[in-house]
Amino acid sequence: MRKYFKERDVPFIIFLMGPTASGKTSVVIELKKQKLGIKIISVDSALVYKNMNIGTAKPSVDELEIAPHQLIDIRDPADCYSVSDFYHDAILEINKIIRSGYVPVLVGGTMLYFKTLLTGLYQLPGKSQNIRNDLIYEAQKIGWVNMYNKLKCIDPIVSKTIHCNDHKRIIRALEVFLSSGKTLTELKQKFLNQQSQRYKVLQFALMPSKREFLYNRIEQRFYKMLKSGFEDEVRLLFSRPDLHDGYQSSISCVGYRQMWEYLSGNVEYDQMIYKGIYATRRLVKNQLTWLKKWPNVHWLNGDNVLIAVNDMLSVLSKYSCVI
């Protein structure tokens, strides 16, 4: 018997976040086995690329058969894929899933993507060269310290996020106010109010009990990728002339960048392994830093998949879920 989610005036979406190698794919596979009325959207800046399967730990063919993921294999490695691209693609998929009567589950570890889904990409007034010129002239007369103090008076909240020496952002914040009559804070709050009315977001995050446990898993996974043909996968990419101009975000992905250095002759094989594992650990540290500051999260056991799934189902049952 399939489990459905009750309809609401504001539709549900679910976030399943977690650091690299925390078991997110395993959890979402088990969720799908529960016959919930859900569909999966990947929130991963590396999984969007085709022909990059091993180094990204992309879900296997069998796993995708159980739990198909949207936004996987949608770009060639030579293509750029920005936060804005993800936001628009994800909103499109979210709305399609909701219209089909299912609940979107967004799973991944690219925390900036998740943040953008919560805050949105709000439109700011266009640049006015006349206003900018006037502001720059004023700054030359009264000094940047006084320009920063002026911003503090106009928009104290935004001024706290801008360094007093960041002249470009000071000018932009003042320009927005002079051209629109609204501060950046006011414009953002108006947009967030509109965003909050679109979806009810339930947020879950996998958190390992010990970081060392996760680091050991990372090391084991990196060696497993090497045995599975990671070097050959990157060699195929390396053979493409269009991937050598240094601008592709795909080749900057953790693991790929280090293997690329090895194939370029810049590091030895053992150095590549060390740097790959180290870079992955730094990525995980960054992800955990994001998560520890993340508001309104239901924390899940990161050491046991079944416990995590049961805890998640328990929370969902309180909000929306019936058999």
Curated annotation (Swiss-Prot):
GO biological process, one term: tRNA modification
A Pfam family of this chain: IPPT
Annotated SUPFAM superfamilies: P-loop containing nucleoside triphosphate hydrolases
Region (Interaction with substrate tRNA): 44-47
EC number, UniProt record: 2.5.1.75
Chain sites annotated for binding ATP: 18-25
Entry's family note: Belongs to the IPP transferase family.
Function noted in UniProt: Catalyzes the transfer of a dimethylallyl group onto the adenine at position 37 in tRNAs that read codons beginning with uridine, leading to the formation of N6-(dimethylallyl)adenosine (i(6)A).
Name under which the protein is recorded: tRNA dimethylallyltransferase
Organism the protein comes from: Blochmanniella floridana
Record gene name: miaA
